[in-house]
Amino acid sequence: MQTDEPTGTATSAIRIPPLISLRTTLMVAGLLGNVVAVAAYGLFSRTERYGAVGNPDPGSFIGVAEPVGYFGASLSSALCLGALIYFVMMVWPQADGLIDAQAFRIHLAEERVSIGWLAFALTMVVVQAANDSGVTPAELRTGAALFNAITTSETSRAWIVVTICALLVTLTLRVIIRYSDHFVLLIPAVIGVIATAVTGNAGQGPDHDYATSAVIVFALAIAALSGLKITAALTEVTPSRAVLIVQVVCGVLALAYGAELVYLLSPGAAMIDSDFGRLGLVAGVLVTLVCFSDCWALVMGRPHSDHRTRLTALAMMAVTAATAAMSVQTAPRFLTHRFTAWDVFLGYELPQPPNIVRFFTVWRFDSLIGATAIVLGIGYVAGFVRVRRAGNTWPVGRLVAWLTGCVALVFTSSSGVRTYGSAMFSVHMAEHMTLNMFIPVLLVLGGPVTLALRALSAAGDGQQPGPREWLTWLMHSSVTAFLSHPVTNFILFVGSPYIVYFTPLFDTLVRYHWGHEFMAIHFLLVGYIFYWAIIGIDPGPRRLPYLARIGLLFAVMPFHAFFGIALMTMTSAISAEFYRSVNLPWLASIDADQHIGGAIAWSATELPVIIVIVALMAQWARQDHRVAVREDRHADSTYADDDLNAYNAMLRELSRMRR
């Protein structure tokens, strides 16, 4: 493919097999075998599944359709996500940003898979509503009956989210041919994969905060690994080393977080005595074998043979079937547990009010955000050491800023701040302001992209693009240009709190742990993008003049103050029904607690603004110093040139006079 970037991309070596081939036949046979197995399980376990929890039996059709539909939707979403990841990692755009003919064939395969995902997801909206209501599809023929069944089923509403994501992916793939658009499509693909996972067993009952964070990582790891394996089996492609590393990482994450989920949802003897536990063990064994195979190929530096590629793809297909069968039954832990309001809304108990000591001692580690912060800190240190060993310099102050931000992120997401913030509006607002106003400043001052570009090696001639090339493309892509535009920055940073807290959206988000995770990630990213435009040292598509950056900073601050004042002056509490349901015995008034939250939002902007102004002034002074030094050097060079020209002119004049 002709491009300004490194040549020798994977698309030139990709061979799309004929429609009917040996490997296609084997994959279809494996698919049909898994469908039959899942359908048989749904049929023969129907009485036990519904009887164990006392739910009405919706009939044989729904009893079989639910696990089969879940398997079909899970497999197609995994294949769609895996194909997108493969496309992003193995394909490189041409100079004009378009994809070539070979890559377009992969694009067409993604489009066809997304249509199947959409069909399964749409079907599951009705099937799940009928299953949770205990009625047959015929009883949902009227619009009112179907609407009522969907609104009372949390999982059915999750399938609506999946349907929207699948529709967005399908329609977009239908009209795009640019590489960057495939990168953006990873967002709805990821949301579609985790939407039903967070509303299932992991999102219910005691310790559901632990389980929800774990299932997000687990669902993404299993989907990505399954999709990459099946994509490799169907396209006859030899995965690059980078893809193999991603597969190993996904396998390790799936094993670690899957073990946590089995421990939380099927503890003790239930791990062996229940179908849920046994299916989990089978899936764990298969993932272990696949992960070991990938590790061996990575260490030996040899790609999988065609035979092993097919076997690992079939194994991950069976893992998807096992997890689908687990998802349609109630976890053993909940069958004998008596639920309390704290189990439903928090997942843990808060018998005592918060204080400084409990903020530092009451920990519930967030295995999603907290673990990510630890990985980011370790990765930064590794990059710092590599740059130093190469004989280059990197300011220690940036290292300190980044690590401080990572530590603050772990503390905010996993300490008593998050534990009490899920139940109290005032503490939640302190968490929000820290994630949105303070931590992003520290992370931006660390300059992680610049460090990564110095630490990562560039791909050589004839090699596939690597992480350094992907990062360079991302920082100068149209997506980054749009997000970093001052108008976009202003709207996101100012509008986010008003949209989240002054609309019914907060009523939904505050009830679920996935909602708290969403808010934390959203406010952290919005804050990072905003402060990157003001004090960021990393490369990007545009940079405002320093005076304009100061103007942008002071332009947004009054809106945050107005937001805090609005919270303090409201006559009714936000999400009062939720906070009354939690019913903290030591909280005297939820209205007074919201007033405190508003005061925190009003006053919490001062310290970050001071830090940003100091950093901005320092950057401005250094920039002026560099300009002055450059001008002085140029002036010295100019004077030297003038003297030389005058001397040469004198010599020419003397020569003329002699003649």
UniProtKB/Swiss-Prot annotation:
Primary location class: membrane
Pfam families (UniProt xref): Caa3_CtaG (PF09678)
Domain of life: Bacteria
Family to which this protein belongs: To M.tuberculosis Rv0102.
Record localization: Cell membrane
GO annotation, cellular component aspect: plasma membrane
InterPro entries linked: Caa3_assmbl_CtaG-rel
UniProt topology in membrane: Multi-pass membrane protein
Disulfide bonding pattern of the chain: none
Membrane-spanning parts: 24-44, 71-91, 115-135, 157-177, 183-203, 214-234, 242-262, 279-299, 311-331, 365-385, 393-413, 433-453, 490-510, 517-537, 550-570, 596-616
Full protein name: Uncharacterized protein ML1998
This protein's UniProt keywords: Cell membrane, Membrane, Transmembrane, Transmembrane helix
